Amino acid sequence: MGRNKEFDTALVLHRAIEVFGEYGYEGTSLQDLLSHLGIARQSLYDTYGTKRDLFLSAVKSYLEGKNAAVMERLEAPGSVKEAIRDIFQEGVNALRDPERAKACYIINSAIEQIPHDPELARYFERQSKQLEDAFYHGLLRAKDQGELNGEDTDISALARYLNQSRLSLTFIAKVTADMDRLQDHVDVSLSVLD
């Protein structure tokens, strides 16, 4: 008969997101994980498998949570343009907060691994497409509501652009401490909606 887990798996995943976000996948040792997660080596292996398995679980937990929030916001009643602005602004606010930013940086760690990990690459592609589709459907609604100018607006290209611009926020925040530059990126990115 197996033993019951004596730790909160959701909390452990949250901590793993922060550790991998702060140190990167390659820079995170097993000892770093054990120390930050507060669990025994065998518990880590029994619950998550290898370091890579834990990393994939952490990335998936982070992305699925963030993507669900974005999709929910895009599907909510009201102004789609305002929803998109809120989504981008929430990204900036998260990156301005050092504690919340740690979690965001797991995306950079994952992107570093994509060339070496086809499973992770396919997962990112699916998640990115899911968000792009959410932006697309939101933009269609915005067009129907009269929020977008121009009959010939390429909704597909605009959805792809917004998705990629949003994803680039973590990279920009990682390479500069100047949050005004991050806000400039958001303002210019969203100017296509005007």
Swiss-Prot record:
GO terms for molecular function: DNA-binding transcription factor activity; transcription cis-regulatory region binding. It comes from the Bacteria. GO terms for biological process: regulation of DNA-templated transcription. Residues 29-48 bind DNA. The keyword Isomerase does not apply. Transmembrane segments: none annotated. It holds the Pfam family TetR_N. InterPro entries: Homeodomain-like_sf (IPR009057), HTH_TetR (IPR001647), Tet_transcr_reg_TetR-rel_C_sf (IPR036271). Residues 6-66 form the HTH tetR-type domain. PROSITE patterns: HTH_TETR_2 (PS50977). Keywords: DNA-binding, Repressor, Transcription, Transcription regulation. The keyword Repressor applies. This is Uncharacterized HTH-type transcriptional regulator YezE. It comes from Bacillus subtilis (strain 168). The gene is yezE.
